[in-house]
Amino acid sequence: MFVSIPNIRKAVVSLSVVPLLAACAFAPGMRFDPQRPLDPADNASVPKITPITPDLVRAGQTQAQVQASHENADVGPLLAKATPYRIGTGDILSIVVWDHPELVFPTQTYSIGSTYDLASFGGAPSVSGYVVSTGGDIQFPYAGVIKVAGKTQNEVRDEISRGIARVVKDPQVTVRVLAYRSQRVYVDGEVKTPGQQSIDDVPMTLVEALNRAGGINTTTGDNSRIRLTRGGKQWTLSMPALMQQGIDPANILLRGGDIVRVEQREDSKVFVTGEVVRPSTVLPRNGRLTLSEALGEAGGVSPVSSDPRNVYVIRRAAEGEPQVYHLDAKSPVALALAEGFELKPKDVVYVDAGSLVRWSRVINLLVPTATPLIGAAAVAK
């Protein structure tokens, strides 16, 4: 039986009608369907979609300001004025009584007592001097056992002067800490030189500790998420937010045993996918990232394949179900809303494809299938 090529073409077209009518459903690639239930067993579990409107943006900005104020209010216990260093257990002292070399520690000289390089001996156990005992005291000739823990260098100097006054007329005493070993803080995470740091006569503020650690790694460190742990309590500090609220991070005074950790920027990344020029992950700057900035980092919505009316932000809520926000970005004015909409860590920004693009993708799938049929008919003829 002879079948003409026109008839075969008609048959191919007829067979193609059914899938083409459902092109959107069969189109390859990802697609956001607001009616698709999250749980296949529960048809009512469709995601709730919240339009991104000026009111929503204003409410989000107000909430962010209130949250920042509460977080900054919590740093009150960390703010303190610097005070003179107080000697502690394990510190090594240099004590010199001028013009009385017999009272100088056997391995020390007058020059050690006056011009010793403290920085090069920061806690080294080989430094010779008077080691503060676990009981917080030292023993000095003619003065006997002296309680020095918790006192400043000047207070210890005055006490030694009074103790030796009966054998030394008008004593001139110099007391200095040679090695600071009683109090340490620990700096970890995304800094250049993590490790422990001894608290010395330079006030150990948060800024000082970070500077001694070489500063925050500008590539991987997140200066908006610095965790400070003290006595079982933890604070999350944001340098930009503190300064914006008028709080100087240099006024945050650390104590012995404090742990400072700079978190990774990578932990706060946002995913941009769908019909954008460069699907990618985007990292925040100074703890902030807006929808407009995220789209800009991804090259913007694709002018060829995207449907700007369907820009979505998918966010995981505390209860586990996703929150979905929708922006109609067809008009450039909508970019002002996108600039005011703050993203959160691990948000997913998705730009849907246009219906014509999905149709085209189905056609591209069907054409390779239909071509062999037409070719076979031509051979049969």
Swiss-Prot record:
It is found in: Cell outer membrane. GO terms for biological process: monoatomic ion transport. Probably involved in polymerization and/or export of exopolysaccharide EPS I which functions as a virulence factor. Keywords: Cell outer membrane, Ion transport, Lipoprotein, Membrane, Palmitate, Plasmid, Polysaccharide transport, Porin, Signal, Sugar transport, Transmembrane, Transmembrane beta strand, Transport, Virulence. A lipid is attached at C24 (N-palmitoyl cysteine). The keyword Transmembrane applies. This is EPS I polysaccharide export outer membrane protein EpsA. It is a multi-pass membrane protein. Belongs to the BexD/CtrA/VexA family. It comes from the Bacteria. One of its GO terms (molecular function) is porin activity. A lipid is attached at C24 (S-diacylglycerol cysteine).
